[in-house]
């Protein structure tokens, strides 16, 4: 027989389910695993519940916490929808909101809380307070560019627009991956490297849309290679999102410029992406 918890801590805006459960474990001075067992949940880790909450576990937690099942589902990483490939950190946050961290740390019951947006690879600003998100992984922090960098300042407005485009794509129409495909494609090497800046490491397609990106990347992230996922450091993510916004605004205009610049193997996927954007 599952016993409901006598005292419940209210969830924070944008808080992950694992964070909310973890704060209760700390409050009751038990381990996270023990709390899950008390709920009748057999999960490998707290984080696994964020990524794949089964109907059984959802019911068990809802009973223990005297909370509506749908409220729990909305606290998961995908909110019950399909997660966008490569855009969600599976374990540790990519970025944090310093303002929210300070606010959480001011109260023992909220200290250590983690927000959903800290794991999402299309975010540049906090959906709770609007503050700029900051890299928190050591390697990304080492290569962090100043927000006042001329290129970052020049594309900031378009980056915010790109963030909204990705948010819309992920939340409202997860089946349409055009914006995500475009985000990936903009980091592809260009087909004709002799057209690049002579000082660029690997000439990227994004430099066609954001002039000066190749030199910026060389200066701020030497040795950067296109990653297997889209969990990019902020200094790279901001220009990429700005590029997404510019292309989405005028897909037919950019089709003429981007398709000749990309390699043969990547051209069909990019062409399909641009065609879908033009029809949307």
Walk through the language-model features, giving the residues of each.
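Basic, alpha-helical nucleic-acid-binding regions used in initiation and control of genome expression
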Residues: 1-280
């Amino acid at each position: 027989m599952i016993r409901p918890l006598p005292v419940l801590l209210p969830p924070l805006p944008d808080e992950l389910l694992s964070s909310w459960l973890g704060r209760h474990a700390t409050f009751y001075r038990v381990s996270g695993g023990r709390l899950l067992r008390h709920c009748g949940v057999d999960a490998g880790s707290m984080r696994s519940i964020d990524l794949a909450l089964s109907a059984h576990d959802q019911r068990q937690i809802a009973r223990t916490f005297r909370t509506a099942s749908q409220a729990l589902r909305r606290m998961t990483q995908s909110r019950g929808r399909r997660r966008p490939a490569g855009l969600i950190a599976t374990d540790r946050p990519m970025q944090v909101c310093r303002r929210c961290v300070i606010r959480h740390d001011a109260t023992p019951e909220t200290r250590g809380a983690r927000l959903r947006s800290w794991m999402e690879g299309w975010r540049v600003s906090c959906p709770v307070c609007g503050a700029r998100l900051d890299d928190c992984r050591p390697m990304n922090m080492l290569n962090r560019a100043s927000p006042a960098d001329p290129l970052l300042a020049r594309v900031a407005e378009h980056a915010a627009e790109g963030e909204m485009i990705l948010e819309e794509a992920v939340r409202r129409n997860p089946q349409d991956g055009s914006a995500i495909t475009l985000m990936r494609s903009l980091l592809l090497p260009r087909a004709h490297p002799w057209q690049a800046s002579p000082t660029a490491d690997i000439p990227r397609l994004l430099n066609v849309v954001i002039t000066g990106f190749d030199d910026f990347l060389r200066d701020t992230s030497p040795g950067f290679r296109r990653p297997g996922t889209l969990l990019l450091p902020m200094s790279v993510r901001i220009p990429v999102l700005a590029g997404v916004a510019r292309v989405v605004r005028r897909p037919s205009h950019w089709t003429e410029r981007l398709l000749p610049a990309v390699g043969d193997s990547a051209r069909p996927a990019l062409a399909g992406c641009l065609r879908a954007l033009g029809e949307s």
